[in-house]
A protein has these predicted regions:
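Conserved active-site and cofactor/substrate-binding residues in soluble primary-metabolism enzymes
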Residues: 3-4, 24-28, 57-64
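Active-site cofactor/substrate anionic-group-binding motifs, chiefly glycine-
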Residues: 39-76
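Short, contiguous strand/loop micro-motifs
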Residues: 20-21, 53
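Alpha-helical scaffold segments in soluble metabolic enzymes
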Residues: 7, 11, 32, 65-68
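N-terminal amphipathic alpha-helix/helix-capping segment at the start of soluble metabolic enzymes
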Residues: 1-20, 39
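A broad, structure-centric signal for solvent-exposed, well-ordered loop/edge residues
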Residues: 29-31, 53
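Conserved, mostly hydrophobic/aromatic
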Residues: 23, 33
């Protein structure tokens, strides 16, 4: 599920848990990170740096795919 990051972090702060931001450099990593979050029932932040995006993938291509994968996830 795709959620507002501020809301997710506010919930984590209020309830006393951390949210891991995972630096993902390709779609295989994004898929693995989201699958692991689903299996563990914990929210995550999929992180991609501007430098990585400029060298490894174009934002116009990868952002819609990441959003689609996040929307299908069972966890934020």
């Amino acid at each position: 599920m795709l959620v507002n990051m501020k809301d997710m972090l506010d919930n984590a702060s209020r309830d006393g848990y951390a949210v891991m931001a995972v630096n993902s450099v390709n779609m295989e990593m994004v898929r693995a990170v989201i699958e692991a979050a689903n299996e563990e029932h914990f929210p995550i932040i999929v992180q991609m740096g501007v430098g990585q995006m400029s060298k490894l993938a174009h934002a116009d291509d990868i952002v819609p795919m990441v959003i689609n994968m996040a929307e299908r996830a069972d966890v934020p």
